Amino acid sequence: MVGGALICKYLPREEQLKLISDLIQNDSLEEVLELIETSPLDITTDSNIETPIFEKITEQVIAYASIDGEAREMFRSSRAEMNKALRTSAQLLCCLPSVWHKFQVWMSYRLNDIISENYKHLFNDNFGKKIVQPFFDSFAEEQNANIKHENLHLDILSLLHYLEVVYLFDECKNGISSKCLDFIIVPLLGCNSEEIADSCSKLMRWHIKYLSKCCNTDSNFDKLIWTFIKQLYAEGSQQAWKQKNSLSFLLRFLLAAELSPELITYIKTDAYWRHIQTELDNDVHEHRKLALSILKLTIQKLSSHGITLQTTFYKCNDLANIEMLGSWKKFTTLYEMIALDTSLNQIQAAKQDIIKIFDNEHLHHSWGLILLSTGLKSSMESVRKYMMTLMFSITNMSAFSSNLPLLTKTLLPAAMSAHYFDVKGVSCPHGEKLSLFVNNLLSQTTEGISDILFEILKLLVEKGTSFDPSRIYLSYGILVFFQNNKQKTINSDHLSLIRKLYDFAAEEEVLETTIQTIYLKFLLYIDPSVSASELLFTLVSHIKLKGGTYKYVEPLFEDYRDLAVSHFDDLQAKENLTTNIGKDTIFDLLASIIFDFKDIDITPDFLIEVAKSKQDIPVYTSKAVTFLTQLLSGEPSNGYTYENATALLSYPNFTISTWKSINVNNLFKSVMEKFSLDKFKFFAEIYQKTYECRFDTIELNFNDLLSLYEMVKKSANQCSRESFKVKDSAYSSYFELLNTFLKTYALNRDSSEGNDDELHILLRLVDENINKDNGNYLGNLAVCKLLYFIIDSYIHCSTSVSDDDIFIVKFIFEKFSFIWECINSERLVLKERDLHLMLIKGLFHPVILYFGSNQYIDTLTSKLEEHAQTIISLSYSRRSLLPLLGSQLRVFMKFYGKLLREDVNYWWLINIIVGVFKQPQMDVNLYKLKPVISSLFDHKLNNYYIKGDELYEKVYGPDEILARVSIIDSILYANDQLKIRLIEKVTEKTNALYAIKRTDGAEALQRLLQWQLLLLSLLTTNEKKLSETSMIRILKSIEDESSPLVRVYKEWFISSKVVDYYKTGNPKFAEDYLFSLLEDHSKPVFVVSAEKICFMVLKDLRNDEKKYGFTQLLDRFICTLVPNAASNKPLVRHFSNSLIISLWPTFKAYLSDHTLRNIIENLYSNAKKTQIFGQYRAGDANIWDLKGDRKLTNMFGGVLKKVTDHDCPYISESVFEKYLQEKDIVPIGTDERSLWLDKRDTNTESVNNANISCDTSPLQTKSGAWETVLDLDNKKSNDVVTRSELIVVSSLVDKPPNLGGICRLCDVLGVGLLTVQDIKVKNHPQFKNVAVTADRWMPMEEVALDEIASFMKEKKKEGYTLIGLEQTDKSVKLDNNFQFPKKSLILLGTEAFGIPGTLLSELDLCLEIQQFGVIRSMNIQTATAVIVHSYTVQHM
């Protein structure tokens, strides 16, 4: 078409109008647009043109947005792309305000119809009525919404998309008004359809200026908008897109216009700043960026306009001072480095700035908490740990009470994370810091302490099933606060939460005892408003929730009694209690114990509760005796059924005289005549009680007990299947009774038929019970105790045993094995721990081990070894198993170790002994924390603690280290033959000599422990009968030793054995081998080992210099050592020189040659000058003494601690003194801590070192945080960024980390386009870790591998020069002379093989980066950076 300007010049107005009319009829709207834009012609007054344009545009929009079919959805699942004609019509609307006005009304009706039909679906009831409806009411006022019009079925998203295009074209002109549309569109930001809300939010990008203008000119509209935005944020708590839309609108408004009156009013409220803080602490990165930009813009606008503001979180006067703005700049910089572009190095450098934020007078404390919170939620563990350390270093504790939700939802839960609770020695540093933190937090709070305490208790309830130690240390912090400040703060609200805490159970007893004791001690600090009944009901709740036990409450009764006297008025308390007495037996008992309440009805249930409580209350003793007498009669009054009657036997005032005076004959007669399980269990218990005081309890015989079994069996079989616990308990009582009976009754074994004697009858009964009648936990436990008693009492070990004894031992072992295999097949249940331990005691009874060692029973030793290995492996995560197994082995070795024969293969026994000693145990926090928490309970919570009464030993028995001490005892008890076999077999059959995996730390530790046993065996053997073959294997193994710790023990072992060879006159083969190592410097480590061995041998032989070849060895050694001191191998040279520091003082008296003496003395003088003391010791410190260090503490870790700073297992003097039995063979030794090497401190950053950072140090930031505000509409902002025409084709690169790095550097250097083979790589975690957020801004395009050639050809047509980054024979050097064409395309090759030949042929040239080193190629990221930077320097 001829240009619009010519038409306007040569055609008259009428012709122009006619031409436009014809063009409209022919759908040539693009030409119409050109004419209108170039012509001064005013067509708004001509309805013949205006109306057809409106109709054409609406026709196009209807066609674009129409939904086919009968479906009544608001939008289609897929939409067509907007064509050129629609874009043209959108531009026409912007040029024709009158047409736009009609179109706006038309569009408003269309949108209103869709929304009206789907109103309940789009908006929640309350939000829709109160917040959204006023918009539609305003629309109805301005436009008569009731006018009849055609209801079209259109796609709302298509309509909004079209409006977005209109607003986009109008953004610069601002020529159209759309207020009536705004009443419809703005509420859609808060609709329940994310797609619609997101579409409206995008539309607002181009329309925000007009909206802001309306807000500043129309107060009603302004109020309507900001009321909606405020409520939209609150509404979005469950639908995140609503909050995002609220923030996006606010940010766009701040960017686009002046503050409106209603926005200023909103800003002056705490809610505005609280919303910003909430979003700064949001887990979503985008929300954080939005909130930070809103914060910066708000402060900048407030300061520039001189607005006075006084809120809780932000305060400023008319003119914000420079210091205040500086404080906010510092905060935003710190926030960016912690929460957005996280960098640990920057955070560490800004440590003091972060800490001082909490003391900044211009910033409310809660802003500092935001920094901590976001840091503690970082994806980088190192940052989380550092921020946790920072949090504990804050001294202004009042800051934490300024935002309780943040404290209890983020900060404290983060501090309770399990991975922080590491154990260092015998303490948990993080746990102690957490307790101190909570204590200080409460101590420094002057107001609202009740609220803080309530929130922390509420957190404990929410975390009731979480990591137990974290709850313990948090609770302990509260308790310490109470104890130190004597505050009576616990009120009724707190008690309701404490009662909920009682409902949670810890994983096992050490943790449960500790945490329940803490919770119970909280009650000692109740507020005066708490009544006596409320206190007791809380205790009742605890007792009932813990299954009726008083074991946690009982140690605190004395404290509660003191509380009752000091805290309550006696008359008021008893008046308060009276109304509740008689309603609950436990309550009545507590009233009696704590408040000395007398007026109580003494019932049998009450007396049983007294017995369970273990409280000495003499006033009830007579009634308890009366009740006991009634029970003993077999016919108690009031129809009592013996349920729970066994608890009465623990009545604290029942003394020895009580038990001596009672008669159980009537009870026994009643049991036999009127049998019931409860009565029988009562009889069994009382029989055991009376047995402890006298032996003539009742005349029972074996047949009576057999009859009782049948009664128990008959009664148990009548129980329902669900009552298996009742049956199990009954059988348990029976076998406990039988066990007690056998202690005073010798079984008759004089039957003519061996299988019919009483012992065999009893064994058959046991077999029947295990296999048929019961086989459950309590019954099996009692059976195992009985079998253990039998084997202990009826089987005697001697050189000859009867067939019957063999049968009995085999039978009992098989029963133990059967039960063990049954429970092990279903995994060991923690609550059945007593049975596990009883089985280990039984399986490894010394008698059974003796029968195995003498091979009396076939396959016994193999089964023993199998069970032992199972137990050893289970002990990795379970306590008590290993110490018991070790103790059983020790008992066996103590009595029978000297009797073990030389001609028997004891590998099974050796394998068990070594397995027990070397078995590692769990290294996780919870496992290591239990002894630490037990110690906390003993020393801080147990009012009656005395040494030897540790909680840990009550629950688990002896420490796990007992297992190793028991094995050491076992070796000491063994005869020489077994020790020699142990050395030979362990070096032959295990990995002791050669590691399976040289870099496996766990294996190295186990090998180290094996060598400790080997050394102990060697040094305690009197007859040195170790075979030469074994010794040669050990000697040669030192050449292949990868572990420096194991090498120490090999050196020690070899040195000791070589000394023996010299003393027996046969040292030649060992000496020659060692000197071959000394002279071969190709392996310096082994030269050092040989020097150590020779030196230690010489020291041991020096007192007998005239014997054993001492002089010859000394001469030969010095002749080798002196040249080694000048070796070209640094390790050999340094060690040889430092060894002379020890050699000269030790052996100078034995050097007679004058020249040699001068040489050694000079070497000694020079070595002394370079000797370094402290952490890094000279070579002489790596030598120990064969005789002086022959002590248990040195053999089991002490020498290692003196010669290396590695972590290594160590058994201390106190442990040996406590657990070792055989103390006469080898001295225990002492803990020579002054000689131990300290661990090198690798922590170069210490938070407590507050003086390192200077107050004036600048904060490092990558982006200028204060000046930079997030441009929300990144498509538009990305267009503003100046980018070059350079294209980087990285489609051949396939590693996500490399692509992430290339993407980041391309964005930094302003590359125009980057291609990748699969655009989905942007979502790969490794790509994101390196690219950070560069993929959001960097223009990227997917070009598959098979499309690279065609893509480059297309770019060639556009004038691009195709350049390959590759080394070829025709490559051009990248130097100062090379000039890049402005339109350059750079093709990157694969990481391994470069650019394929098929693509090389398509290139115009190849560039090669000049290289001057040895390596031929560089990393693809580095190469790309070099070439792209070279281009950028020339063209940007």
From Swiss-Prot:
GO cellular component labels: cytoplasm
Keywords, ordered alphabetically: Cytoplasm, Methyltransferase, S-adenosyl-L-methionine, Transferase, tRNA processing
Chain sites annotated for binding S-adenosyl-L-methionine: L1365, E1366, Q1367, G1389, I1409, Q1410, Q1411, F1412, G1413, V1414, I1415, R1416, S1417, M1418
This enzyme's EC code(s): 2.1.1.34
Highest taxon listed in the record's lineage: Eukaryota
Catalytic activity, as annotated: guanosine(18) in tRNA + S-adenosyl-L-methionine = 2'-O-methylguanosine(18) in tRNA + S-adenosyl-L-homocysteine + H(+)
GO MF entries: RNA binding; tRNA (guanine(18)-2'-O)-methyltransferase activity; tRNA (guanine) methyltransferase activity
Record-linked InterPro entries: Alpha/beta_knot_MTases (IPR029028), SpoU_MeTrfase (IPR001537), Trm3 (IPR025759), Trm3/TARBP1 (IPR045330), Trm3/TARBP1_C (IPR044748), tRNA_m1G_MTases_N (IPR029026)
GO biological process, one term: tRNA methylation
UniProt family annotation: Belongs to the class IV-like SAM-binding methyltransferase superfamily. RNA methyltransferase TrmH family.
PANTHER family in the record: METHYLTRANSFERASE TARBP1-RELATED, RNA METHYLTRANSFERASE
Further remarks about this protein from its record: Present with 861 molecules/cell in log phase SD medium.
Name the UniProt record assigns to this protein: tRNA (guanosine(18)-2'-O)-methyltransferase
The organism of origin for this protein: Saccharomyces cerevisiae (strain ATCC 204508 / S288c) (Baker's yeast)
Lineage of producing organism: Eukaryota, Fungi, Dikarya, Ascomycota, Saccharomycotina
